[in-house]
Every structure is written in structure tokens, then in C-alpha cells.
């Protein structure tokens, strides 16, 4: 451009800025005629200013800005076509097309589009609430089913426990304790009978063979804690201790081979043991002789009601002189009834004669003592 046309160019630039400002103000007041205003002004400017390259470019930029300003602005809230409520909003992110804008009514929770129909199905928060309620109902139904199953299982378990317990009339303790009683083989306290799971094992307390006529036989099953002691006190079923037997003086000589096996003579009745109490109280029924033999006196036919302890209390008694022991032994042999071996020894001492040394028939004597000819249980 020549220097002569600079002033014209400057003159064109200043009026163009003023025209653009005026066009913007007019577009804000009335958007409809704003599109035609720049064209007339630009045409007048072009006619007054003559030819130039810049004015057409400025005119095109003004037309684009006015078109951008010509877009429809946000309108006020529309009334809902269903409930006629103004609590509506324009959906910016849920529109399919700007030609048919979409709106949402917050009151009746319905969508509608301009120029379209109203949707009858509620969407949004309402559907979520419905889904939550349905899911809660679905979760509640399995819970109720599991509760019913647990009730049925508990009932079946209780029925099985009652059936395996053998009936509540026989032993109701099993039902209350859940059939977990580990002491089924022993009698229960309170007189309850044990279940008949062990019919082949008779009761030791109620047995008439071990203790005939005793208090435990009459009472049936007694206390379970004393069953072991009564078992030890029984006198007819088990092998007792070695019975001290009286032997002649000839067999006690040092030259005789069996003299060292002779039992010590029995002590007197009022003897004191190493434990500090008398051990002869168990044999007071048969007199001094029965007391001297201690627990083995019951084997010779002496009537007993409670039995004798089978503990080796004879070892705890102090030793007695041979003279006193001999008198006690002779008295013991005379006082015991039914002791055939003691009667036999007494007769041999009284006779003082016979075959063999000391007037005794040695084979017959030992056969009677060891072979069971006298009827004594060994």
C-alpha cells in the first residue's frame, strides 16, 4: 500500500471498530436484526472508502461473530406437559439432538422432548430405589430359607438324640446332657440305672457269688465309689493271701529243708502295728485265734457281713517270741471251725506217733495241704 493511502486505511480501521461495537450492542438487545446490520454498514464503508483488501476480511469476521451470538440462549423453565410444574430442567448431557432438546420434570420424574411425546416410564432415582427394594427382598428370602433349614436341622438332631438315648423313661439324663455321658458303664448317682449296653457283665456289687447275704447284695447297686473296696473285701471269689499254718517242731528243725518256709506265729490280739493302730479288729468275730489269722480267718467258715481287707497287714505287725506264738498258734487251731488242716495238725501233735518222722505220714500230710484234699481254696 502506498503512503498516500495510509490515512484512508487508518480512517477505515477506526470506523470499523466503532461499527463492531455498535453491532454487538444491537445483537444483545435484539438478536434477530443483528445479522443484517453489519452487511449494510460494511457496504457503506466500502462505498465510502473505495477499494481495499482489508475491509472484506473484517466484514467476514464480523458476520461469524454475529452468527455465534445469534444462537438461542437458555430459556426460562418450561412447564411440564404432564403435571404442569415449573420444577424442570434442560438436559445438557442427555440430549440426542439440539433440534429436539430434552427436558426433565423433577416433580413427576419424567423426560420429554420438545416436539416429541411424554415418556410414561419413570427413570433415574425412582428406578434405583425400586431395584434396591427388590434386591433387599431377594436377599431376605434366602435368609428366611436358611433360618427354616437351621430349625429343621436342629429338630432332626434333637429327635436323633432322643432315639439313641434309649428313651427318656429309662435314663432321662442322657437327653438333657446331649448323649455325651462318658460314664455309661458305671451306675449313676440318684439311683438311675445305666442303659443295657453291657448285658454280659454282671454287677459286682449285686453278685450273690462273691458276697452272699451281704448288705451290698440286698441293696442291689450301691455307691459306685465303694465298688473297688467291696471287690477287695469279697472273700469267696478270688484267691486269698497265704494262710499261716501250724507245723510240728520236727519240720521246723534246721535239718529239714522246708523249715525255713514256715510262716511266723500269729501275734496276740492286742498287738500294735507299725502304723500305730491295731490290725486285729478285723478278726474279733472268731476270738483270739480268728484275730490272730487276720484277713484269712474268713476262709475257715467264720460268718462275716462286711468281709476282710486283702492287704498284707501281717507284714506290718511286730514279731513275737516263739513261746507266746506257739501258744497262740495252738489256740488258733482250736478256735477256728472248719479248718481241716489245723485239725489235722492238732491230731498229729496229740497222737505223737505214726509212720514217718514225728508220727506223721509225710506224703499224705502234704497232699492234704497242697492238693486240695482238705477242701480249702488256694
Swiss-Prot record:
<feature type="binding site">
    <location>
        <position position="80"/>
    </location>
    <ligand>
        <name>Zn(2+)</name>
    </ligand>
</feature>
<keyword id="KW-0238">DNA-binding</keyword>
<dbReference type="GO" id="GO:0003677">
    <property type="term" value="F:DNA binding"/>
</dbReference>
<feature type="compositionally biased region" description="Basic and acidic residues">
    <location>
        <begin position="66"/>
        <end position="77"/>
    </location>
</feature>
<dbReference type="Pfam" id="PF02701">
    <property type="entry name" value="Zn_ribbon_Dof"/>
</dbReference>
<keyword id="KW-0862">Zinc</keyword>
<feature type="region of interest" description="Disordered">
    <location>
        <begin position="28"/>
        <end position="79"/>
    </location>
</feature>
<protein>
    <recommendedName>
        <fullName>Dof zinc finger protein 1</fullName>
    </recommendedName>
</protein>
<keyword id="KW-0863">Zinc-finger</keyword>
<feature type="binding site">
    <location>
        <position position="108"/>
    </location>
    <ligand>
        <name>Zn(2+)</name>
    </ligand>
</feature>
<feature type="region of interest" description="Disordered">
    <location>
        <begin position="316"/>
        <end position="378"/>
    </location>
</feature>
<dbReference type="GO" id="GO:0008270">
    <property type="term" value="F:zinc ion binding"/>
</dbReference>
<feature type="region of interest" description="Disordered">
    <location>
        <begin position="116"/>
        <end position="148"/>
    </location>
</feature>
<dbReference type="GO" id="GO:0003700">
    <property type="term" value="F:DNA-binding transcription factor activity"/>
</dbReference>
<comment type="function">
    <text>Transcription factor that may transactivate seed storage protein genes in developing seeds.</text>
</comment>
<dbReference type="InterPro" id="IPR045174">
    <property type="entry name" value="Dof"/>
</dbReference>
<dbReference type="InterPro" id="IPR003851">
    <property type="entry name" value="Znf_Dof"/>
</dbReference>
<dbReference type="GO" id="GO:0005634">
    <property type="term" value="C:nucleus"/>
</dbReference>
<feature type="region of interest" description="Disordered">
    <location>
        <begin position="203"/>
        <end position="222"/>
    </location>
</feature>
<feature type="binding site">
    <location>
        <position position="83"/>
    </location>
    <ligand>
        <name>Zn(2+)</name>
    </ligand>
</feature>
<feature type="compositionally biased region" description="Low complexity">
    <location>
        <begin position="133"/>
        <end position="148"/>
    </location>
</feature>
<keyword id="KW-0479">Metal-binding</keyword>
<keyword id="KW-0805">Transcription regulation</keyword>
<feature type="compositionally biased region" description="Gly residues">
    <location>
        <begin position="45"/>
        <end position="63"/>
    </location>
</feature>
<feature type="compositionally biased region" description="Low complexity">
    <location>
        <begin position="28"/>
        <end position="38"/>
    </location>
</feature>
<feature type="compositionally biased region" description="Gly residues">
    <location>
        <begin position="369"/>
        <end position="378"/>
    </location>
</feature>
<feature type="compositionally biased region" description="Gly residues">
    <location>
        <begin position="350"/>
        <end position="361"/>
    </location>
</feature>
<feature type="zinc finger region" description="Dof-type">
    <location>
        <begin position="78"/>
        <end position="132"/>
    </location>
</feature>
<feature type="binding site">
    <location>
        <position position="105"/>
    </location>
    <ligand>
        <name>Zn(2+)</name>
    </ligand>
</feature>
<keyword id="KW-0804">Transcription</keyword>
<feature type="compositionally biased region" description="Gly residues">
    <location>
        <begin position="323"/>
        <end position="338"/>
    </location>
</feature>
<keyword id="KW-0539">Nucleus</keyword>
Amino acid at each position: 500500500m502506498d503512503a498516500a493511502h495510509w490515512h484512508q486505511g487508518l480512517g477505515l480501521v477506526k470506523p470499523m471498530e466503532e461499527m463492531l461495537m455498535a453491532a454487538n450492542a444491537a445483537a444483545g438487545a435484539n438478536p434477530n436484526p443483528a445479522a443484517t446490520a453489519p452487511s449494510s454498514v460494511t457496504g457503506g464503508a466500502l462505498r465510502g472508502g473505495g477499494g481495499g483488501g482489508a475491509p472484506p476480511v473484517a466484514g467476514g469476521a464480523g458476520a461469524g461473530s454475529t452468527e455465534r451470538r445469534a444462537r438461542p440462549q437458555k430459556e426460562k423453565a418450561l412447564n411440564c406437559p404432564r403435571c404442569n410444574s415449573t420444577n424442570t430442567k434442560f438436559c445438557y448431557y442427555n440430549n440426542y439432538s439440539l433440534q429436539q432438546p430434552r427436558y426433565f420434570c423433577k416433580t413427576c420424574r419424567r423426560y420429554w422432548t420438545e416436539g416429541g411425546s411424554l415418556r410414561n416410564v419413570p427413570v433415574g432415582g425412582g428406578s434405583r430405589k425400586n431395584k434396591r427394594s427388590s434386591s433387599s427382598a431377594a436377599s431376605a428370602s434366602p435368609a428366611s430359607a436358611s433360618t427354616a433349614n437351621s430349625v429343621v436341622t436342629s429338630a432332626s438332631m434333637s429327635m436323633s438324640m432322643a432315639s439313641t438315648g434309649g428313651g427318656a423313661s429309662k435314663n432321662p439324663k442322657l437327653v438333657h446332657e446331649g448323649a455325651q455321658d462318658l460314664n455309661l458303664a458305671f451306675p449313676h448317682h440318684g439311683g438311675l440305672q445305666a442303659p443295657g449296653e453291657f448285658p454280659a457283665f454282671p454287677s459286682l456289687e449285686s453278685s450273690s457269688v462273691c458276697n452272699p447275704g451281704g448288705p451290698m447284695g440286698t441293696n442291689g447297686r450301691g455307691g459306685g465309689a465303694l465298688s473297688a473296696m467291696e471287690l477287695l473285701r469279697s472273700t469267696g471269689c478270688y484267691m486269698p493271701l497265704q494262710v499261716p499254718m501250724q507245723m510240728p517242731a520236727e519240720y521246723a528243725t534246721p535239718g529239714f529243708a522246708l523249715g525255713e518256709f514256715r510262716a511266723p506265729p500269729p501275734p496276740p490280739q492286742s498287738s500294735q502295728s507299725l502304723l500305730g493302730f491295731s490290725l486285729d479288729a478285723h478278726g474279733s468275730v472268731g476270738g483270739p485265734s480268728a484275730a490272730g489269722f487276720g484277713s484269712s480267718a474268713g476262709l475257715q467258715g467264720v460268718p462275716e457281713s462286711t468281709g476282710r481287707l486283702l492287704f498284707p497287714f501281717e507284714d506290718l505287725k511286730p514279731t513275737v517270741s516263739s513261746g507266746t506264738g506257739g501258744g497262740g498258734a495252738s489256740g488258733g487251731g482250736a478256735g477256728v471251725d472248719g479248718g481241716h488242716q489245723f485239725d489235722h495238725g492238732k491230731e498229729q501233735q496229740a497222737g505223737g506217733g505214726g509212720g514217718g518222722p514225728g508220727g506223721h505220714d509225710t506224703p499224705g500230710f502234704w497232699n492234704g495241704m497242697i492238693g486240695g484234699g482238705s477242701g480249702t481254696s488256694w
